[in-house]
A protein has these predicted regions:
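Helix-to-loop junction immediately C-terminal to a conserved catalytic motif
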Residues: 52
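ABC ATPase NBD coupling module
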Residues: 15-18, 69-85, 114
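Signature (C-motif/LSGGQ) region and adjacent switch/coupling loops
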Residues: 17, 73, 100, 126, ...
Length: 138
């Protein structure tokens, strides 16, 4: 579960402050899949970066699985981030790897066994309707 309470993020620029995220409150239940859409420069990427604290909001609360991320120390935050997935706006697929191999790549550092990685990749591809593309190159 992800819950944001009155999250705001402002950037200071030479032309004044830019309010990238202003007083956002939302809740995403476990198992739900959300997309954030909007015009270029609307704050979509900044909002997502606030969820995993790649950007630290100036105000509000960021709660993931019942943990207030802003209250965690650096080590606790690193451990928590291992359980948070994010798809970047401009992501790069490795053309020399299949779709399944691209999905599996970050899992090799997670400590999972090969069998667990294969199972996880299979379930993730099924979740987004790409099981039939597992062995296709991008």
């Amino acid at each position: 579960m992800i819950r944001l309470e009155h999250v705001s993020k402002t950037f200071a620029t030479k032309n004044g402050d830019v309010h990238a995220v202003r007083d956002v409150t939302l809740q995403i239940a476990e198992g739900e899949i959300f997309g954030i859409i909007g015009f270029s420069g609307a704050g979509k990427s900044t909002l997502v970066r606030c969820i995993n604290l790649l950007e630290r909001p100036q105000s509000g609360k960021v709660i993931v699985d019942g943990k207030d991320l802003l209250a965690l120390d650096a080590a606790q935050l690193r451990e928590t981030r291992k359980k948070i997935g994010m798809i970047f706006q401009h992501f790069n697929l490795m053309r020399s790897r299949t779709v399944a191999q691209n999905v599996a790549f970050p899992l090799h550092k997670s400590g999972l066994s090969k069998a667990q990685i294969k199972e996880k990749v299979s379930s993730l591809l099924a979740l987004v309707g790409l099981s039939d593309k597992a062995d296709v190159y991008p």
